[in-house]
Amino acid sequence: MKFSYWGAGILAVALTVTLGSNTLFASQPLTAATEYMQKNDSDSIKVENLAKELKKLKPISSDDFKSKFKKEISGFKLTEATAFEDKETGSYATANYAKGSKNVYLMVTDGAGAGAEQVKGNLLSYLELKAVEEPGDKTNIKNYKGWSVYFDHSMYENDKMTSIQYLEGNRYSVVASGTNIPLDELKSLLDNISL
């Protein structure tokens, strides 16, 4: 497609006027949008650098992975722990903790070696969600253990389900799902986990 000099000039003026006022539809000054983009870019670079370092590491063995789960955390007792090794996707493990009617299920992926791509993908998706997050959403992206991570209340109040997806120890991608446990109590339990 060829543009005439007039067409290119009109397009340049239109872009300058649009970007010079407020960003389209957001009613934010260009400086605020630019600052957010720069922060998001620096967060993305941080994620990329982490993934490069994780790829260099050797994945944890299944026996060592299972042994990382404490028998009891904040009154929750470990009822089950399993771990697996896969050359294509890396090592991963699951654990279940229970206390009365409260239940916390953990799915953990070792970010070392092949698992680095999953860790990278998760962290980048949290950054993307943060960009569209609105007040009142049941899903919130918060800073937790040094990274932007996913905090989620259930869509339905009566099912009492919560979820936190985060990065533990700059290596392990954790999905923690709770039943009959409020989000703040789930976070408190996760504060006491160290892999």
Predicted feature residues:
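Short, aromatic- and cysteine-enriched interfacial helices/patches
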Residues: F3, L24-F25, L124
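C-terminal segment of classical bacterial N-terminal signal peptides
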Residues: T16-L24
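Long, hydrophobic/aromatic N-terminal blocks
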Residues: F25-S62
